[in-house]
Design a protein with these regions (language model features):
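Walker B catalytic acidic pair
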Residues: 206
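Active-site-proximal or metal-binding-adjacent scaffold patches in catalytic folds
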Residues: 1-201, 210-251
């Protein structure tokens, strides 16, 4: 039997009256029940336990159609869509640094490369192609996140006594981080835009999954031993998506 995630495709965000809101489906081994997430720019994600039937997902979404539409409308009012524009300056709160960005076109080039000179980032190539520029900026953020976050994560690993096998840096659209059963910690490079205290909490959270691959009472007790203010930081982390610049296209 195909999974719900494979059977249900991503619907458009401009559904016809009477139809279900557009949504994507993500299967989670940790999920015990179906849940719906609405992101600031209107994207809707349904998180389901493994082996959930597609028709059950559709029924669940239909049940919550009014709530989804109200939530999306509320987000649209608070976070109106901004016109797309490539950045010329980027502020990364997590590492307390700002970077200037310049774009240098190269005739006949078919790609865009980046090179960093201190706090200046230079993109060269087919810079008239905004998509290629954004992809280059994402590669730069991923490389910088690995450079900055790996020593930080290893330091917290020693502090908490929780180990990990390797670090993976990605640009996930659905989560800030994860810890696999094989010991791989995945961290979202968008954390570079958040405050250091929130990033530190996320790292401690994922490291504590080395001993508790769930969100049980023991897990939260472990987190609390190393970050007493975890409840407030967890709420701040969950509310942080609007801090990510729109040109990244993350949500």
């Amino acid at each position: 039997m195909q999974s719900a995630a494979r059977q249900l495709k991503l619907f458009s965000d401009t559904e016809e009256p009477g139809e279900s809101p557009g949504f994507s489906v993500r299967e989670s081994g940790r999920a015990k029940r179906l849940s719906i997430k609405v992101y600031p720019h209107g994207r809707v994600e349904v998180v389901v336990p493994k082996r959930t039937r597609a028709r059950d997902v559709q029924s669940f979404v239909d049940e919550h159609r009014d709530w989804i539409k109200k939530t999306r409308a509320s987000f649209a009012e608070k976070h109106p869509p901004q016109p797309f524009a490539l950045p010329f300056r980027v502020r990364l709160a997590a590492i307390d640094r700002s970077f200037r960005i310049t774009y240098r076109p190269v005739r006949a080039s078919t790609n865009v490369r980046f090179r960093r000179h201190g706090d200046l980032l230079v993109l060269t190539g087919k810079t008239s192609d905004e998509k290629l520029c954004v992809e280059a900026l994402k590669r730069w953020l991923a490389a910088l996140a690995r450079q900055e976050f790996e020593p930080w994560l290893r330091s917290l690993s020693a502090l908490t006594g929780n180990s990990f096998r390797r670090l993976q840096v990605r640009g996930q659209k659905t989560c800030w981080g994860s810890h696999s059963s094989s010991g791989t910690i995945s961290i979202n490079y968008c954390l570079l835009f958040l405050e250091p205290s929130v990033v530190r909490y996320l790292m401690i959270h994922e490291l504590c999954h080395a001993r508790h691959m769930n969100h049980s009472r023991r897990f939260w007790q472990a987190v609390g031993r190393h970050e007493p203010d975890y409840r407030q930081l967890d709420r701040r982390l969950g509310d942080s998506w609007p801090q990510i610049p729109g040109w990244l296209g993350i949500y």
